[in-house]
Every structure is written in structure tokens, then in C-alpha cells.
């Protein structure tokens, strides 16, 4: 059965001046799923976020949210979307309690508990002024205000920016629990891949001009493998073989990244008459897999 897609980006092409960001990019985010967008700096993550929130019009193609073009969203559809962009909070002279009361007057379906549940979880005091908060605390107040609006779709750009490791773990556990319990759809980015791995259902990995992976994160980290081995020489090129997604080596130590299995990699080496030793499959986190797929540099 075809999933119900909340976000659909169809044949997106965009340039900055004459520089191609991506061409004919397609993205689908299914209802009720948490999707994480990963890519190196300059791969097009911010461009995608800006197209989704309507700040930027693609050169060609279109992005749809709930079936409407993001350049022309109706007021009803806009109310279904919560954006967190770098955690900016207006009215920083207010405290935590005052800003909640102020915002609640604009939203008829305001969920006060959603705001204070997050604030209490992160141990932010109700009387603390926004102006005295760290960047990470401000971002969480902004997110609390978004959750209280009860959107169906959350778009979170660098969602854990500025939080220390302990608070990040608290927030991630809370966010996953909240999204599943309330059946929310989430599209997010983060530079901290370990955080993303704990939170997401699906992964989208972009490299320059293209999508490398869009799949359930568990499927990707199960199928994509790293094998290490040592060779007698350090000048053997393996990158051009169809089985190789990426190959890194330092002197005679090789890291071979592939969607193939152990027997296929061993067969490749043996068919080329390459003597090898210390052949191992390495366990991989999402961060390891991302670096293996896109390269270290």
C-alpha cells in the first residue's frame, strides 16, 4: 500500500548563481515518520530547509506539503506546520511563563502542557528570562512554543544546537516519545549524527548534486558494510570496482565500504590475485556509515 506522504519534493533543481546545488532531487517523507537529513557542508541541506519553509523558490521542480506547493501554502496548511530554525525566540525580555501566556492568545488549540512538559524535562525554571538563557535553552523554549501549537509536521533545523550532552540525551528521548505518542511527522537536520541516530526512523543522505540514500535507517546501517584488511602493497586501486562504494587506505591498511557481503569482497581480492591478511568486518554506527559513504574529506 502506497504511504501517505506529508512532504514530497519532485525534481527539485536549484543553483546559486552558476553553481549547481542539486538537480532533479526527489524526497518523500511519510506520515508519522521521523526523517533525518544528513550531508556535508555545502551539500544542500540549508537550501532544502529554505525551500520547505517557503523562503526560497527552486529554479525548477516543486516541494509539496500536504499536497500544497510550499511557495503558496494556505493559512490552514501553515497552521499544521511547526518550524524550528536556529532556535530564535522573539521578546527576549519576557520570562518562560510570560512568553507562553503571550503566545497562547494567538492559537485556539494551544496545548499548554506540551510546552511545560518540555520545559520541566529540561529543568528550565518558569521565571527565567529568555535574555539570560544559553543558545541551547532558547532553542528549547522555541521548540516548546512550537509543540504547544500542536502542529502535525515539525521541521527542525539543527534541533540540538547548543545543548550539552546530558540535555541532548534528555531532549532526544522526550522528542521521540512525544512524536510517536502524538503521531507527528518530523523532518530534521543535525550536525551531531549520534543524536540523530537515536531519534530518527528514516535517513536521507545528500552529497553534492544528488541523494545517496533514502531508506529506513536500520536498513541502511544493516546493508552498508565496512571491511578492513591489509595488503602487501599500498598502491593497489580498488575504488573503480562496481562492488566498492568507497575505499580509504593509509599505507597498506584498507577500509573497503560496500553493499556487498564478505564472500563477494574476498572473491574480488582473490580474482585479482591480491594477497590480503587480517580481513575483518567492522561494526558501524550511523556516523561511521555516513563517513564511509561520503568520504572523510
Model-based region annotation:
Residues 7, 22-24, 78:
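Conserved structural motif at the start of ABC-family nucleotide-binding domains
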Residues 53:
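Helix-to-loop junction immediately C-terminal to a conserved catalytic motif
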Residues 61-72, 76-77:
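Conserved ABC transporter NBD signature motif
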Residues 85-141:
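ABC-family P-loop ATPase nucleotide-binding domains
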Residues 154-158, 163:
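Catalytic Walker B motif of ABC-type/P-loop ATPase nucleotide-binding domains
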Residues 170-259:
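ABC transporter nucleotide-binding domain
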Residues 257-297:
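C-terminal coupling/interaction segments
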Amino acid at each position: 500500500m502506497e504511504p501517505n506522504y506529508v512532504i514530497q519534493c519532485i525534481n527539485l533543481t536549484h543553483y546559486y548563481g552558476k553553481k549547481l546545488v542539486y538537480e532533479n532531487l526527489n524526497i518523500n517523507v511519510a506520515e508519522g515518520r521521523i526523517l533525518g537529513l544528513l550531508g556535508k557542508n555545502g551539500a544542500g541541506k540549508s537550501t532544502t530547509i529554505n525551500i520547505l519553509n517557503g523562503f526560497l523558490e527552486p529554479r525548477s521542480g516543486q516541494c509539496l506539503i500536504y499536497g500544497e506547493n510550499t511557495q503558496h501554502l494556505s493559512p490552514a496548511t501553515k497552521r499544521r506546520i511547526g518550524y524550528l530554525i536556529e532556535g530564535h525566540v522573539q521578546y527576549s525580555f519576557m520570562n518562560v511563563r510570560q512568553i507562553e501566556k503571550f503566545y497562547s492568545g494567538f492559537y485556539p488549540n494551544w496545548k499548554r502542557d506540551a510546552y511545560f512538559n518540555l520545559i520541566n524535562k529540561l529543568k528550565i525554571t518558569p521565571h527565567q528570562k529568555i535574555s539570560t538563557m544559553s543558545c541551547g535553552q532558547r532553542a528549547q523554549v522555541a521548540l516548546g512554543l512550537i509543540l504547544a501549537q500542536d502542529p502535525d509536521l515539525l521541521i527542525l533545523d539543527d534541533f540540538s544546537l547548543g545543548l550539552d550532552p546530558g540535555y541532548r540525551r534528555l531532549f532526544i528521548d522526550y522528542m521521540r516519545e512525544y512524536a510517536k505518542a502524538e503521531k507527528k511527522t518530523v523532518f530534521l537536520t543535525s550536525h551531531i549524527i549520534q543524536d540523530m541516530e537515536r531519534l530518527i526512523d528514516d535517513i536521507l543522505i545528500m552529497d553534492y548534486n544528488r541523494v545517496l540514500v533514502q531508506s529506513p535507517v536500520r536498513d541502511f546501517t544493516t546493508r552498508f558494510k565496512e571491511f578492513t584488511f591489509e595488503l602487501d602493497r599500498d598502491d593497489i586501486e580498488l575504488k573503480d570496482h562496481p562492488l566498492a562504494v568507497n575505499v580509504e587506505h593509509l599505507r597498506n591498511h584498507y577500509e573497503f565500504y560496500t553493499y556487498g557481503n564478505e564472500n563477494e569482497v574476498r572473491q574480488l581480492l582473490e580474482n585479482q590475485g591480491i594477497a590480503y591478511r587480517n580481513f575483518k568486518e567492522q561494526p558501524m554506527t550511523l556516523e561511521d556509515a555516513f563517513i564511509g559513504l561520503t568520504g572523510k574529506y
